[in-house]
Amino acid sequence: MNKIRNDFNPNLKQFFINLQNYLDTELYFYGSVNRSDYVHNKSDIDIAIFTDNEYSIMTKLQHYLHVKPNTFDKIVWKLEGTIVYGYKIKCDKHTNSKCEIAIYNNDFKEIILKDMHKYNSIPFHIGILLFILKTLHYTFPILSSKTYSAYKRVVFNQIMVNKKDTSFVLLKQNKV
């Protein structure tokens, strides 16, 4: 989960190595980037960072990525009855890939990692459904990004895991 893929292009791989060294903390990759259904240059790269001081990591990221403080969005997530808080930043333009980094306090590390592990290996039938969705979205762009995301949430949260006591809110900052 905290390994940088060997098959990333050299620039992308170096970006994550440099970022990890600069932040002096582990990067936890999660989602399709850890599975065989990852599509290079199409699938997004999701990363979680756990820390005792979110603001310190955000400041370091701000300097590393040369972004303003309002680039970070606030996360409020009800996960298995626990309210989780954090921050997210998109770093697409720095990686030339769809990439998102989430920053959480170490207090939430155990529950978040437990949730992330559920998605690192998937049953065969879920893999087939994802293959169909990704083909319709990436290869034959029949599904819009919004529709693709909605169907993917249904596949994961209702068919695979059947999440009932979970909700996720992303509070967007005013980007001026």
Enumerate the language-model features and the residues they cover:
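Acidic Asp/Glu-based divalent-cation binding sites
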Residues: 44-46
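Catalytic core of pol beta-like nucleotidyltransferases
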Residues: 1-17, 22-23, 34-42, 51-176
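Glycine-rich beta-strand-to-loop/alpha-helix junction loops that act as flexible
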Residues: 30-32
